[in-house]
């Protein structure tokens, strides 16, 4: 054991000499890769040796060729972390991870955070997250949120969402969180994201981070439109739980934000925020359709006005917003109840949009329709009838001519979006009838064109699979459909050369 320990000490000492560095790192990396589990004291020695971390420093000048030693060092430290019995209840853990978590190389910090997160996930899986002995580890991870060059914001927030609830009421932890709110807007937004993740967990945790959420709300008075849009995006998940929605109601968040739309004429700069506000209300309506559709009619009026526009800068967000409003059964019922005429008018406009707008906007339109019509559990009759009415407004009747026109375009992405929507409406009986009523549609689906993209062939095959199980077709047609399905999506028909005698002159 002593000889083995001396070998590692010698190799670590060699790191001080630049000419010997790469050979020493390579030797240690090879040695640790061969061992399933090195003795704990060797792993600890490696993780606490300054010279090893110095080898992981990236070049200050990006034009300088990459030092191979950096990659070998990262690999070696990754092996160390894998072999470390990482006990989050151990007082020593923060000192073992400190150099990695405070290193200037974001890739190294990401490795340490990933290893720690993996360990915490195991604890979560068995239902026993160990109690941290002090604040040190939390402080180190909170500092990652302040790093200007980070690859690991999400990792750090995921870790903190697991361990921070243990010590969120601690005065020193609260002071550390307050420090984040004094940083630049990027760091502040990371703090807001963390607060929302914690607040979603319980009403108690929401209470503990209310001061951060309140700071986020204060940003809505900022002159920076991009910052306001980012904050609105971060706040959306609060509405997923009733306690989060209650907080938003107490702070009148929805009222304040919707008022910005009403006062656009007085404050023209607020017009820049309207797409973000629409997105905000649309996403919240996925969780709280009654609150949004029933409570903010002027927001819906603004949305319907945008959908009648042909301005391609605002249409994508508007179409996504309508999809969010109409994605749930309750959303469909409420829209049909309160805005029946506006919905029919919007779907008719969608039909005309498919003839006028650019290909990528048409694709976005079809994707939004896919979201509205798709379902996981069979819908009630009322939902089926609402969807049928909206579709016929879009298509101009009980047929699929518009969709087939979009399939017959030279844009593969648009073809795929159109086929995907066709497949979705074929989940409804009225959709199958619409397809059946469309001249050439079934023949196109049954054709075996060789030049089609594989994804398109597969989508056609999926649609035929649905049609083969439908009672809308004759037994003869069903046999043809079933044969097509059994042949598979990529079946190639053999070319038959029929020999014929040349016709002689009479």
From Swiss-Prot:
SUPFAM superfamilies (alphabetical):
ARM repeat (SSF48371)
Which Gene Ontology biological process is one annotated for this entry?
A: proteasome assembly
Q: One Pfam match, by short name?
A: Proteasom_PSMB
What are the disulphide bonds in this sequence?
A: none
Domain of life of the organism encoding this protein = Eukaryota
Reported effect of changing residue 45 to A? Does not affect interaction with PI31
Recorded hits in InterPro entries, A to Z, give: ARM-type_fold, PSMD5
Assembly, in brief, is:
Interacts with PI31; this interaction is increased by PI31 ADP-ribosylation. Interacts with Rpt2.
Q: What does this protein do?
A: Acts as a chaperone during the assembly of the 26S proteasome.
Q: Which family does it belong to?
A: Belongs to the proteasome subunit S5B/HSM3 family.
Q: State what protein this is by name.
A: 26S proteasome non-ATPase regulatory subunit 5
This chain's source organism reads Drosophila melanogaster (Fruit fly)
Lineage, broadest ranks: Eukaryota, Metazoa, Ecdysozoa, Arthropoda, Hexapoda
